[in-house]
């Protein structure tokens, strides 16, 4: 029940569009929202708790004070909301993680001899900006490609023409030395124009222009210039070949999809210009727990395009976005031309979104692994597991188990081992299911556990089987856990610690406990368990595909998302065999027509 002051504030709210700010007892802004009608929107929070999500219930319980700002339209409210979220970073808002100062590329068109460099701020100074980029690594790579292609100056001298001797960058072919008159002003300006076209995704235009300039230089016997153009042409062709998408796309568009775990979402954006992938960026969103997919995409789009220097005419999203009409109106105003937002639910847009979503899932997994890479984090994770699960010691050795089959055929099981939080691949083991007929995962798990622990006391057990785990992790919920616990009891291992991790809600099940344990999404302990479970799944799936191939039912390439019959034939033709594909480097795979970097990554991981 709101306090008296809050009730009076709610009662006096106007029926205008605007922005509302919710504060806690300490005066901290904990949520910022916009509304077409302030009174109706704010009153919708103060309803019976059964009609609210747990996250909204938690927000409402902390509201102590309310402020609002009236705007002339809902579009003005959207812009004001964005600025307030960026300034205050309220806890309950969906917000970009570490969004302070994303890097941009700046072209100093206000200078006589323009430079291109990285900056974290934009100013109305006559420069041209491209971005934002998600991290400095990606923007540095782009800058390096530009430098190799166009050899613009990087020094910050205000009067470079006064220097008579070229610097080291000229000697190593990284600068055309305008400071010594090695290039005319018109030629240098032309070069910068090409760099801008390149950043806009118009590499085809740059390529045609360079071919013409090379031929003209050759015709006038200017072989040095012709050789420079030839090298630029070769470099651009290499870039274009790496931009081919597995999905057939045309025109200019951004494709946006995300993967979510609890309170954290990883958003992937593909930038497509003239049917080619000219770049992609990943962004972390915080505060997404219990948020609707359309709301997550809407909040990201607002925050991303608020600071983006390039807005395409079309944006394809994984799900229909909330506030689509007002977003389109706002983006169209920013672009100066019509912008359409559409959900990729079928056909070619769905094919494209599936690729983007797969990249988002991979980026989220890599972020989780990176977060667990430090010994301090791993120690924290193991200590948290000890406390949460009631173990006597931190689990030094964790074994993860999973089953893989299709309707009971070619069924296999996997065992992966993590010691002190790190995978020990030499101890991984796989099992071909021998006694179970049909699709009975529970019985298959029983067989795997019986065979694994039946070897503990055998002389030929080996180090992997001779040692008992501190903790067993089963991929599944109550049913799978009960089957395994029953098997362990029959083997006389009643005291063996075992848990199940159910994927849908990431809940941890313990024997003899009716309610699962729920850890925070950013918990090191949960992230470690997720990594063990995912590794067991990957190892089981890889063995299952191998068995299917040997039985003649399929190629090992089957089951890899995005690899259909035509791409499978092309890969076999290029590398000769599945073994040749397996041995090919990531770079070689990425160069095959129709195989983009995301698909090459999937092939390397699953083959």
Swiss-Prot record:
Gene3D superfamilies per record: 5' to 3' exonuclease, C-terminal subdomain, GIY-YIG endonuclease, UvrC, RNAse H endonuclease domain
Keywords: Cytoplasm, DNA damage, DNA excision, DNA repair, Excision nuclease, SOS response
Protein family: Belongs to the UvrC family.
Domain of life: Bacteria
SMART domains the UniProt entry points to: GIYc
Stretch forming the signal peptide: none
Pfam families noted in UniProt: GIY-YIG, HHH_5, UVR, UvrC_RNaseH, UvrC_RNaseH_dom
Functional summary from the UniProt entry: The UvrABC repair system catalyzes the recognition and processing of DNA lesions. UvrC both incises the 5' and 3' sides of the lesion. The N-terminal half is responsible for the 3' incision and the C-terminal half is responsible for the 5' incision.
PROSITE patterns in UniProt: GIY_YIG, UVR, UVRC
Domain GIY-YIG residues, every copy: 15-94
Name of the protein: UvrABC system protein C
Regions that span the bilayer: none
Subunit architecture: Interacts with UvrB in an incision complex.
Gene Ontology CC annotation, any one: cytoplasm
Annotated organism of origin: Dehalococcoides mccartyi (strain CBDB1)
Subcellular location: Cytoplasm
Higher taxonomy: Bacteria, Bacillati, Chloroflexota, Dehalococcoidia, Dehalococcoidales
Record has Metal-binding as a keyword: no
SUPFAM superfamilies: C-terminal UvrC-binding domain of UvrB, GIY-YIG endonuclease, RuvA domain 2-like
Sequence ranges assigned to domain UVR in this UniProt record: 204-239
Listed GO MF terms: DNA binding; excinuclease ABC activity
Example GO BP: SOS response
Matching InterPro entries: GIY-YIG_endonuc, GIY-YIG_endonuc_sf, GIY-YIG_UvrC_Cho, RuvA_2-like, UVR_dom, UVR_dom_sf, UvrABC_protein_C, UvrC
């Amino acid at each position: 029940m709101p306090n008296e002051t809050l009730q009076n504030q709610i009662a006096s709210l106007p029926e205008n569009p605007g922005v509302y700010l919710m504060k806690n007892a300490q005066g901290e802004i904990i949520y910022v929202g916009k509304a077409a009608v302030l009174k109706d929107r704010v009153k919708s929070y103060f309803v019976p708790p059964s009609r609210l999500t747990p996250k909204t219930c938690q927000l409402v319980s902390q509201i102590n004070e309310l402020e609002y700002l009236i705007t002339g339209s809902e579009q003005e409210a959207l812009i004001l909301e964005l600025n307030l979220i960026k300034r205050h970073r309220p806890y309950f808002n969906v917000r970009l993680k570490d969004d302070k100062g994303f890097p941009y590329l700046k072209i100093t068109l206000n200078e006589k001899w323009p430079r291109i460099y990285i900056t974290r701020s934009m100013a109305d100074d006559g420069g041209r900006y491209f971005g934002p980029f998600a991290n400095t690594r990606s923007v540095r790579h782009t800058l390096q490609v530009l430098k190799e292609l166009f050899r613009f100056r990087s020094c910050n001298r205000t009067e470079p023409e006064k220097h008579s001797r070229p610097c080291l960058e000229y000697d190593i072919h990284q600068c055309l030395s305008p400071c010594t008159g090695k290039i005319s002003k018109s030629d240098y300006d032309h070069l910068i124009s090409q760099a801008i076209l390149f950043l806009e995704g118009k590499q085809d235009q740059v390529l045609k222009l360079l071919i013409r300039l090379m031929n003209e230089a050759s015709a006038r016997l200017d072989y040095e210039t012709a050789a420079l153009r030839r090298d630029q042409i070769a470099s651009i062709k290499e870039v274009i070949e790496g931009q081919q998408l597995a999905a057939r796309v045309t025109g200019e568009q951004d494709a946006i999809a995300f993967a979510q775990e609890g309170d954290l979402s990883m958003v992937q954006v593909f930038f497509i210009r003239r049917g080619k992938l000219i770049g992609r960026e990943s962004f972390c969103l915080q505060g997404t727990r219990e948020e609707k997919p359309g709301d997550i995409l809407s909040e990201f789009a607002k925050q991303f395009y608020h600071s983006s220097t390039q807005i395409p005419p079309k944006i394809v999203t994984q799900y229909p976005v909330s506030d689509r009409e007002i977003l389109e109106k706002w983006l169209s105003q920013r672009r100066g031309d019509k912008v359409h937002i559409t959900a990729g639910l079928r056909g070619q847009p769905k094919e494209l979104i599936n690729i983007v979503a797969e990249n988002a899932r991979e980026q989220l997994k890599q972020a989780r692994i990176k977060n667990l890479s430090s010994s301090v984090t791993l120690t924290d994770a193991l200590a948290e597991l000890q406390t949460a699960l009631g173990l006597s010691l931190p689990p030094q050795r964790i074994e993860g188990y999973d089953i893989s089959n299709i309707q009971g055929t070619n069924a296999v099981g996997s065992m992966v081992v993590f010691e002190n939080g790190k995978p020990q691949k030499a101890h991984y083991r796989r099992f071909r299911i021998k006694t179970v007929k049909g699709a009975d995962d529970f019985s298959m798990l029983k067989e795997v556990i019986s065979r694994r622990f039946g070897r503990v006391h055998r002389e030929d057990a080996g180090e992997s089987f001779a040692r008992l785990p501190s903790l067993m992790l089963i991929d599944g919920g109550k049913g799978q856990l009960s089957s395994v616990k029953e098997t362990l009891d029959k083997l006389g291992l009643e005291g063996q610690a075992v848990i199940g991790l159910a994927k849908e809600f990431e809940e941890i099940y313990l024997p003899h406990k009716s309610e699962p344990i729920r850890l925070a999404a950013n918990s090191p302990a949960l992230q470690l368990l997720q990594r063990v479970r995912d590794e067991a799944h990957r190892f089981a799936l890889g063995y299952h595909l191998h068995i299917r191939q040997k039985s003649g039912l399929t190629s090992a390439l089957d089951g890899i998302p995005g690899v259909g019959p035509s791409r499978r034939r092309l890969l076999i033709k290029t590398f000769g065999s599945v073994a040749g594909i397996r041995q090919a480097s990531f770079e070689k795979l990425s160069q095959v027509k129709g195989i983009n970097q995301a698909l090459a990554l999937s092939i390397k991981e699953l083959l």
